[in-house]
Amino acid sequence: MYKTFLFDLDGTLTDPKEGIVNSVLYALKKVGIEEVHISELDSFIGPPIQQSFIERYNMSEGEVERAVFYFREYLKQRGLFENNVYEGILKLLQQLKSSGNRIFVATSKPTVFAKQVIEHFQLTNYFEDIIGSNLDGTRIKKEEIIAHILQTHEELNKEEMIMIGDRKHDIIGANQNGIASIGVLYGYGCEKELTEVSATYIVKDVEELYHFYVEKNLIQQ
């Protein structure tokens, strides 16, 4: 039975689309790149930001550093809070917590920013720890973030842990650390993406995620 829940942040707990897209556009303007296919910038939601800039614009290391600097500049000023908690998430966290489960945030977003988002939406009390990447560009992969949680909480039992996320990076991170995973379809991944990396379970929305927990007797109604 699962007793420890690792939640991705962007696209799983909150919908950060407006803030992330605006942060990317701000950064691109600063480095002299014009993006005409703005709808395709959804791909920046979830993966490490450095990776997204490299894959889409074939940036050099120096260009990535500049782009990330400006991305974070806008994010800190406005982008973090151009964001919304998905409907049903608060109830889900309340039920998981009151049923005695342990809950963590495991995100590729820098820890300092993730904590600001969680605090802004008054969700801090539901999480035992909030773990993200480092501002210096280290610990950006989801497998590294999950491994860090396991290392700093040695008492955790992998067989009782499950990672919940909307992108393949969440599932890959779980697989590489030997824990189960739930891929959610209400974020920014698709069923094909999550199936190809062997998500343990897939749910279509927050309501189905809630009922999954009920059926598994993981929460008390």
Language-model features: locations:
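Active-site neighborhood of HAD-like aspartate-dependent phosphohydrolases
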Residues: 1-43
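Conserved Lys-Pro-Asp/Glu-containing loop-to-beta segment of HAD-superfamily phosphomonoesterases
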Residues: 4, 142-171
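Helix-loop "lid/cap" segments that line or gate small-molecule binding pockets
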Residues: 27-28, 48-61, 117-120, 145-151
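Metal-dependent phosphoesterase signature
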Residues: 54-90, 99
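Substrate-recognition element of Asp-dependent hydrolases with the DxDx(T/V) motif
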Residues: 24, 92-118
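A short, structured active-site edge motif that brings together acidic residues
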Residues: 124-139
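Conserved H-loop
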Residues: 34, 124-128, 203
